[in-house]
Amino acid sequence: MELVNICKEAGVPDGVVSLLSGDPAEISNELMESDIIKKVSVTGSTRVGKIILKKAADKVQRVTMELSGHSPFIVCEDVDMNKVADIAITGKFRNNGQVCISPNRFYIQENRKDEFVNAFMERAKKLKIGNGMDEGVDLGPLTTAKRLEEIEKLVDTTKKEGAKVLMGGQRPSGFNKGYYYEPTVFDDVKDNFTIMKEEPFGPLVPILTFKTFDEVIERANDNDLGLCSYLYTNSMDKAHIGSEKLESGCVAVNTGVVAIAEAPFGGIKQTGYGREGGSGAIKDYLNVKYTHMGLKI
């Protein structure tokens, strides 16, 4: 909403940028059924994206889809664990984990796992929960009551499947209102657990270990979603091989920054298709026309 206000203040003519707020299903139906709309870009869950894609098929409507992500966060043995923990904290708990590119599946090389977990939890325990508009607050609430309910359900499921809660796993004390949930770290997680298949979209951190680089790449790719991958290593060979073999639209190597305006951003698999950002993004909004013209006849 603020962005639309800025456009207006900057002198963008009325009608160039419009904002609709209301029932998402009703608004999307209206847009998809309109003959005026020539292109639709969707940011949302894979479930919702599939619904809109079916509607688009009736009109052969052009769409760009940036859907769910379930990003792996791979930490090799040759890195500074304190530096990686700093990146992990910022990336994981930005907007309390409610970001499509949030790292969700943490794979740590087994001989450095304890070091990473200790460094990560030391930082996570210092995060202040509260009103996001207040000074010094690091973690605000989840977006809705439904999101809080789904997080609690996933935590219960993860524990029942055999995971151990190292920290968190509950609503914070002293918060009688709002959809707050503590940063939660799990140990003893296996690849077939629900949390490794479904995007948590919240402050949940499952920790797993790996022995070899080839093994962890294969395990990281064992998912229907492919938005972003994070890889931390001081080996340029592993950095290049990992960036090529990881099945995602974006790869961040030794950094937590992956989405920038000048670069193409988007996913593969059931995360969708099309790109936002970069010079290539505008192509989805243009028609390609070929004309073959003789000089005279």
Could you say what each language-model-derived stretch is?
Residues 25-27, 47-48, 58, 237-238, ...:
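Short alpha-helical
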Residues 28-29, 85, 214-217:
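Short hydrophobic/charged patches on amphipathic alpha-helices used for structural packing
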Residues 37, 74, 160, 173, ...:
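Conserved C-terminal structural/oligomerization subdomain of aldehyde/semialdehyde dehydrogenase
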